[in-house]
Amino acid sequence: MFKEYDEETLKKLQRTELEILKDFLWICEQYDLTYFSFAGTAIGALRHKGFIPWDDDIDVCLPRKDYEAFIRAAKKEFPDKYTVMNAEENENYPLTTTRWMLKGTSFREEALKDIDCELGVFLDIYPFDNVSDDEKEYKKQAWDAWFWSKILILRCIREPVILGTGFRVSAVKAACRAGHWFLKTFGFSKKK
């Protein structure tokens, strides 16, 4: 689901994200970290020699070891310029991805409009972990990741964005509200 921006706003957002990317690359070079672009960022780089024209974020990945080293280095090298936002840093943050956010900026996606944490212009950072070669174990890992990501969203967002109308959508939204209430009432935390 993409938000539509006027061209000037989108270009300003993309320029700011490129500045964040330059600092990300600097850390990766200084600390000899392996990284690569991902999803729309990789497509944009190959197909458009930059951003996909409507893309509003940059996605980068690092192997888990390098991801952990990046988080430590980012806090050391740029403590006054950026905030690391993830489940460990803020229990009101509902996503499993880490965002490296430029301080002094504000950027809130529609799906995250009701969460209780400050959000700024960011770089999405994904750690890549090894998965099992055993198909059964791999499916369990994939299901666990999917399930817990949804629980984290429900913990922080009373009514997630769900497209569509009708009885089914209304029932799912009601179930989400009930799940949110349960998780908040009984103190589910990402850190537990």
Language-model features: where?
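Conserved catalytic core of two-metal-ion nucleotidyltransferases
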Residues: 2-29, 74-133, 151-192
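Active-site nucleotide-donor binding segment shared across nucleotidyl transfer reactions
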Residues: 25-58, 67
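Short hydrophobic/aromatic beta-strand micro-patches
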Residues: 61-63
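Short, conserved charged micro-motifs
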Residues: 68-72
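A short secondary-structure junction signal
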Residues: 134-141
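A contiguous, mid-domain pocket- or channel-lining segment that forms the substrate-recognition surface
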Residues: 143-150
